[in-house]
Regions:
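Basic/polar N-terminal segments that are highly enriched at the extreme N-terminus
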Residues: 1-6
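Short loop segments at secondary-structure junctions
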Residues: 27, 32-33, 54-56, 65, ...
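A glycine-rich, hydrophobic loop/mini-helix early in the fold
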Residues: 44-75
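Conserved hydrophobic/aromatic beta-strand scaffold that supports enzyme active sites
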Residues: 23-27, 61, 125-127
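Residue-level structural signal for beta-strand termini and adjacent loop
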Residues: 40-41, 65, 114
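Acidic, metal-coordinating catalytic segment for phosphate/diphosphate chemistry
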Residues: 7, 11-49, 55
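Unchanged
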Residues: 37, 47-49, 54, 79-136
Length: 136
């Protein structure tokens, strides 16, 4: 099996920049020589997800309305990693902010690129076992 080769970036233009989403149009040349004059890339911040399990074995999930999907759904506690935070620091902060839970034994579960064909960010997932409600 051949090792994939990088594409050559010929030009890049930002279409818009917002704190939560930036879009750019790249002009690239593939290893075969074929050029793609409009390859769109979305730049999102990295985020973290938390699989949080209580001492009694219950998983902490939450319901939130998500406008892009037009519905209320269940999801894991999650959020954007702020500047200067490590992924673990962000995960601990997000779990507490969104659910009021904390403590427990934390471990890194995985880091993935959620949509590497068009997005440049990473999602860091943590497993927190033995979480409990935290008082202020």
């Amino acid at each position: 099996m051949k090792t994939p080769q990088n594409w050559q970036l010929l030009d890049s233009e930002y279409l818009f920049r917002y704190p939560w989403l930036t879009a750019r149009r790249d002009h690239v040349r593939l290893p075969s020589g074929v050029e793609i004059p409009e390859y769109f890339v979305l730049e999102y911040p990295d985020w973290c997800n938390i699989i949080a399990i209580t001492h009694s074995g219950q998983m902490i999930i939450e319901q939130q309305y998500r406008h892009a999907q037009g519905r209320v759904g269940y999801e894991l506690p999650a959020g954007v990693i702020e500047n200067g935070e490590t992924p673990l620091e962000a995960a601990r902060r997000e779990l507490y902010e969104e659910t009021g839970y904390g403590h427990g034994q934390w471990s890194h579960f995985m880091t993935i690129s959620p949509n590497p064909g068009s997005c440049n960010n990473y999602s860091h997932t943590f497993l927190a076992i033995g979480v409990e409600p935290v008082s202020c």
